[in-house]
């Protein structure tokens, strides 16, 4: 997660997503992770790719404008997802068929992890992002953690 902290200095809006995003919401690591998923302002796609390649990452999968997966022997896998950000707080991501996924403002938030405030996909957003496909074992695990986060938030609000 050290790279996530460094990305905060890029002046680029981003959110931690995927399994690490779930664990950050929960406040601790609950499983092993193959990669780190970052959703970010699509206006910075070239700049982010240049930075990652300068740090030793090589492109493994290029499905732009939807996503790019990169790998570094020293740093592992990172999966970046360009989002078009709108002034009203909504956003969208290109899908593989030429359409768009549309996202509401409350899908984005922050959580404290290891004493730092980390921009991440909210529990509500994680539920949506974990739908529309056949769930793998790790997705089922992540959804159970998300449900625990939502239950804890509901108890705290009351």
What are the residue ranges of the model-derived segments?
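Anion (oxyanion) recognition and catalysis
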Residues: 8, 53, 112
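Structured helix-beta-strand junction loops
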Residues: 10, 54-55, 149
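Catalytic cores of NTP-dependent nucleotidyl/adenyl transfer enzymes across multiple folds
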Residues: 93-158
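Short amphipathic alpha-helices in soluble, non-transmembrane regions
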Residues: 48-54
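Short, solvent-exposed loop/turn segments at secondary-structure junctions
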Residues: 21-22, 85-87, 125-127
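Active-site nucleotide-donor binding segment shared across nucleotidyl transfer reactions
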Residues: 6-36, 41-42, 47, 122
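Conserved catalytic core of two-metal-ion nucleotidyltransferases
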Residues: 57-91
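Short, small-residue-biased leader/transition segments that mark boundaries at the very start
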Residues: 1-5
